[in-house]
């Protein structure tokens, strides 16, 4: 909206052309989302507290978590609100990728909202049945995958890029591309959701990965930079940097309220949506393997659950003291803040490795 306004003004006042630069709008998006979250956050937390939208705590989990019972949840709605408003303000609304990411984020957010609502408002401990949740996630992810496959401008836009190797890509074709896209979006969404079990644990890696994806999106959308760095040029993908900036800004503000001891939890409405957003942006800029690297913490958390379930069903024994992985370390004696900060440090290292793939080829 603001971009269109400034472009109109720029016809008479050239100084306003500065707002056409994606880099500036990305920074402004981050600051705008940060400000919106700080302004709305306290009122939203008070409203959730008044309505008794509190989180229930697993009785078989770490005893230190019992004090968290009743903490307001569904705070992810704050992030989504800030991101959507900011993106509508600063992004180019004629860009198809912006709408694709917004709609995907909203779709997965709606699934999470229904799940949270049934748990904390209707007091249904199971929330949205797993089968229903998976069904709707699959529908949205497949629609996105088919759309991207059908609108790919070049065959290379459906190849899987292998990092650290110059001009090495695996041709997938439409069918395998759709499967990969589906797995990335659904997998990323659920991995972030599984990670969101400690104060600040999921949101900070999300912020860091969003910042990195903003760089990848900008480079992929810039023909000269993409050619120089040896990555696929995806026309119009650069605009996704604005969305990533908004996500990073909103996430940082949310961390202010989510840091230990948390005043509010993200809930499924936030975790599912943010994970899906990271997944679809990654697919658009063709950096699926890099996401696995940068999101290593999310990957470890998801794998720990799968390994735990498979081991117990097949052999009747558990590999970890408790899954997801962060609870395993808590039960080993790590303090909550130790787990969170150490996982943040791991993410910083992995994000730097991911960014290094731009040059190390």
UniProtKB/Swiss-Prot annotation:
Its main location: membrane. GO terms for molecular function: metal ion binding; phospho-N-acetylmuramoyl-pentapeptide-transferase activity; UDP-N-acetylmuramoyl-L-alanyl-D-glutamyl-meso-2,6-diaminopimelyl-D-alanyl-D-alanine:undecaprenyl-phosphate transferase activity. It catalyses: UDP-N-acetyl-alpha-D-muramoyl-L-alanyl-gamma-D-glutamyl-meso-2,6-diaminopimeloyl-D-alanyl-D-alanine + di-trans,octa-cis-undecaprenyl phosphate = di-trans,octa-cis-undecaprenyl diphospho-N-acetyl-alpha-D-muramoyl-L-alanyl-D-glutamyl-meso-2,6-diaminopimeloyl-D-alanyl-D-alanine + UMP. It is a multi-pass membrane protein. The chain crosses the membrane at residues 28-48, 73-93, 97-117, 134-154, 168-188, 200-220, 237-257, 264-284, 289-309, 338-358. One of its GO terms (cellular component) is plasma membrane. Its EC number is 2.7.8.13. InterPro entries: Glycosyl_transferase_4, PNAcMuramoyl-5peptid_Trfase, PNAcMuramoyl-5peptid_Trfase_CS. Keywords: Cell cycle, Cell division, Cell inner membrane, Cell membrane, Cell shape, Cell wall biogenesis/degradation, Magnesium, Membrane, Metal-binding, Peptidoglycan synthesis, Transferase, Transmembrane, Transmembrane helix. HAMAP family: MraY. Catalyzes the initial step of the lipid cycle reactions in the biosynthesis of the cell wall peptidoglycan: transfers peptidoglycan precursor phospho-MurNAc-pentapeptide from UDP-MurNAc-pentapeptide onto the lipid carrier undecaprenyl phosphate, yielding undecaprenyl-pyrophosphoryl-MurNAc-pentapeptide, known as lipid I. This is Phospho-N-acetylmuramoyl-pentapeptide-transferase. It comes from Nitrosomonas eutropha (strain DSM 101675 / C91 / Nm57).
């Amino acid at each position: 909206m603001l971009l269109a306004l400034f472009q109109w003004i720029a016809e008479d006042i050239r100084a306003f052309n500065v707002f056409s630069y994606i880099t500036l709008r990305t920074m402004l998006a981050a600051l705008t989302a940060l400000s919106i979250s700080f302004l709305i956050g306290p009122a939203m937390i008070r409203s959730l507290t008044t309505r008794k939208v509190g989180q229930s705590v697993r009785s078989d989990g770490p005893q230190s978590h019992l004090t968290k019972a009743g903490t307001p949840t569904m705070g992810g709605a704050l992030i989504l609100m800030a991101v959507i408003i900011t993106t509508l303000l600063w992004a180019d609304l004629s860009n198809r990728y912006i709408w694709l990411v917004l709609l995907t984020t909203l779709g997965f957010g709606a699934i999470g909202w229904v799940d949270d609502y049934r748990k904390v408002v209707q007091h249904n401990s199971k929330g949205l049945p797993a089968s229903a949740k998976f069904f709707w996630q699959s529908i949205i992810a497949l629609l996105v995958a088919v759309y991207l496959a059908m609108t790919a401008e070049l065959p290379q836009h459906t190849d899987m890029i292998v990092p650290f190797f110059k001009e090495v890509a695996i041709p997938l074709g439409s069918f395998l591309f759709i499967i990969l896209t589906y797995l990335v979006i659904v997998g990323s969404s659920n991995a972030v959701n599984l990670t969101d079990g400690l104060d600040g644990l999921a949101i900070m890696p999300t912020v860091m990965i969003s910042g990195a994806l903003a760089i990848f999106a900008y480079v992929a959308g810039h023909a000269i930079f993409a050619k120089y760095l040896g990555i696929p040029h995806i026309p119009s993908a650069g605009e996704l940097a604005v969305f990533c900036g908004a996500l990073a800004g909103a996430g940082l503000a949310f961390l202010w309220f989510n840091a230990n001891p948390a005043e509010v939890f993200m809930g499924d409405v936030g975790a599912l949506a943010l994970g899906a957003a990271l997944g679809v942006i990654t697919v658009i800029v063709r950096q699926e393997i890099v996401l696995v690297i940068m999101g290593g913490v999310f990957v470890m958390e998801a794998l720990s659950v799968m390994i735990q379930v498979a081991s117990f069903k097949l052999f009747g024994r558990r590999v970890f003291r408790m899954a997801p992985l962060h609870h395993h370390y808590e039960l080993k004696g790590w303090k909550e803040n130790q787990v969170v900060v150490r996982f943040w440090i791991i993410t910083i290292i992995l994000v730097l490795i991911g960014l290094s793939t731009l040059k190390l080829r």
